[in-house]
Amino acid sequence: MSGFQAQLILLSLVSYVIGSIPFGLLLTAVAGGGDIRKIGSGNIGATNVLRTGRRGLAAATLLLDALKGALAVLIARFFFPGASETTMAVAAVAVVIGHCFPVWLGFRGGKGVATGLGTIWVLCWPVGLACCVVWLLVARLSRISSAGALAAFLLAPGLMVLLSGRPLHTPIPVATLLISLLIWARHSSNIARLVTGREPRVKVDQASRR
């Protein structure tokens, strides 16, 4: 094993651990909201935290989940020996895997949307901005958060190629594609409900009044 390969393994582990911090679970518990895994969909992400009726708590979860994605890529970019697009791509994928499959929760985590967006903001901020706009616009119009997330990550790989000028086969577009595929896979049950018209809508206005 080469030194660079060993560094990539270490970076993957560091990024995975960062991603596996379950902010939704921790914040809800500290705020006296109980175990978020026993509320709503049982997911630890911001959308399910919003179902507790605590809009500020959901916003904090969204922000912190995004920041851990950004942090992993920033570590790979500025603090890791031999920093390159490859190290940034590895960190981006590993931190999203950590969020989706945290060892502390029996590998049952979130769906990776906020963390994925956090990585993309650092990899190429115009793509991150475009994905956020798509997500928020579709979610606002449909009142279905999963629809916004799926739309954003359907477009993310193509946007990365177009806006960053990188060929599809290079590390950062490949990482964006892998993250998008993982997020779509994590939304398989949502997709099934969207097809049948049974996907629940997020009652943002009701939540904001609590």
Swiss-Prot record:
It is a multi-pass membrane protein. This is Glycerol-3-phosphate acyltransferase. The chain crosses the membrane at residues 8-28, 56-76, 87-107, 119-139, 144-164, 165-185. One of its GO terms (molecular function) is acyl-phosphate glycerol-3-phosphate acyltransferase activity. Catalyzes the transfer of an acyl group from acyl-phosphate (acyl-PO(4)) to glycerol-3-phosphate (G3P) to form lysophosphatidic acid (LPA). This enzyme utilizes acyl-phosphate as fatty acyl donor, but not acyl-CoA or acyl-ACP. Probably interacts with PlsX. Its main location: membrane. Its EC number is 2.3.1.275. It comes from Gluconobacter oxydans (strain 621H) (Gluconobacter suboxydans). It is an enzyme of class 2 (transferase). One of its GO terms (cellular component) is plasma membrane. Pathway: Lipid metabolism; phospholipid metabolism. Coiled coil: none annotated. Pfam families: G3P_acyltransf. InterPro entries: G3P_acylTferase_PlsY. It is found in: Cell inner membrane. The gene is plsY. It catalyses: an acyl phosphate + sn-glycerol 3-phosphate = a 1-acyl-sn-glycero-3-phosphate + phosphate.
